[in-house]
């Protein structure tokens, strides 16, 4: 499969945020079979026109001129499944003005300037289907809307946010296009489109443009706005398993799953990580006390108050010792193998500068390791390396650090990098050099080496070497502290041998451990730590989903929505309902305002009491926001709505409506069902888009399409005379009499024919596995309640 901007599915797995592979969806079928291809026609919006030799003169023959800027009329963030794809996108309405008459091959020098600024565009395959495909389109002639799409995607990629989906479509208004790009963050996506417009106009008008500064701004925004790498790798793994997620704040608090089935993570902490356990892990003395009580070796040591106290502790413990901050990170402020009073005193100052208490403990000889324990199992292990610089007879040690150490692409200040920049003025580094008789200004003779960092360089994966005894001891330590996920720092000579036999010891047990060292080791394989955490939270085939029913009609579908919710609620499930009549939780109405939008739906899915949910939607909300859920168990389409009131969204023709409404069926899970009104031919035609089963309903039991469906052993809900009938193939079961007093009373109270609403609701409940007897009882109870006179 290929994404429209040219990257293959395998290439588009994001390095630090959610995956774009959509492997649990049939999104690529949607893209390929719908209008979504840069050279395809038809569908909701027509594709950009092709360029013929008669239309586009050779660029060399065209005079250079200055064009007015492309105008971005508005941008919308479609947060849920939409007419374009299953994932969040930015949709921009773009007016290219007079450039409608000037394709790319009619703009002198444009191709050369654009490709020089963004050489990565060669990776975009576009509709050509191979590397360099977009550049072929660019050279042969394509329009600025299409170019804007690819440039925005490339800017996001250069900023560290790889995404693989983009579209540019004409709206029907001359020179006005819908430009759509996949993004993981609204602010980043919008800035990418605005920056792409500025860059494209600079290339068209032969003006200078600072590409590096633009990418730097976007990179900074990605770092500030997007999920951190540890959280993101868990979300990626969950997404690959079909587990939905909702970001709950601007940081790294993420909900995995929906409603009562949800779990929550915050970086590498989960809702099973207790505050008590985290508090214990922060108290290093208490942690060592508890771990030692369980029989796991730890170094002797204590917290100290001053440099003098540190030396007294060192004398009591016995030299050599380690001095470190109690709450250090990335081994900042840690000094090892200290043997003299002067060294201990200097090390205390370096540790105290980190802003926490200072610990002195016995030095354990060996190599430092970090082991990740998840759910009582060691799932990853890395070994540290000592960092040296090698002299050339000319450069100072400070210069050698910059040229030999800080050039490592894994080092830097960005959150997604596993190692920090090494600074020559760091107090621990100064002490380390002093102990070697050196300073940052010392010049090493050619071939001589100096140690510049002893701790914090977890770079070598050793997961496959961990001895079972060590794995057992690490799991025990995590359990004693009370952490479901723990990063354990271990010093041992050989991780492939039993712990106690070689005098190794646990030096720290950490809550919320960083995962980058396991994702980006310098040597060895990256470990699937995100997958391990996802499995820990959702064992087996768990997806964290609650039953969701999505429904769309012609604006009169609230009754069916309320019927479905009542059937589920009366089955004993706490059911949320967001529909045109308002927002409901069980029998309680939370709001009387229309709740068709994204936010009311998401509000219900965040609620931990919700065991099932029913969401009514409309074409406008699909176009303007997207659905509030990624997939549903049941998708119901009652009627094909018309285009009235959608002109501002460039929908003016009834022929455009099926492509909008199909979104509701596109998101049906493979184990779910589409419930379709067989009496509406346009609705019936949506059956092909369902990944799951199709259940038809009809007030005409002799309808030919229903008969053909039943001949294929399909299920249908029918109104036959006085009966509502459940049919599976040739088998039929009478469910309830429509002549029952509660039905007739309800019919007199409500306008129109209530039968389609009842049939749709019965079909949805049946699709969810509600037994017929319970459907019957719940249906009669609902009608009884609705038909009862109001009490004032």
What are the roles of these predicted feature ranges?
Residues 2-3, 17, 29-35, 41-240, ...:
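ATP-dependent carboxylate activation and anion-phosphoryl transfer catalytic cores
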Residues 3, 216-221, 244-281, 297-302:
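A short, GP-enriched loop/loop-strand-helix hinge that lies immediately N-terminal to
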Residues 238, 489, 578, 616, ...:
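Residue-level signal for inorganic ion chemistry
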Residues 400-457:
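Extended, charge-rich helix/loop segments that form flexible
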Residues 541-582:
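Walker A (P-loop) phosphate-binding motif
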Residues 650-658, 672, 691-792:
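Adenine nucleotide phosphate-binding catalytic loops in nucleotide-utilizing enzymes
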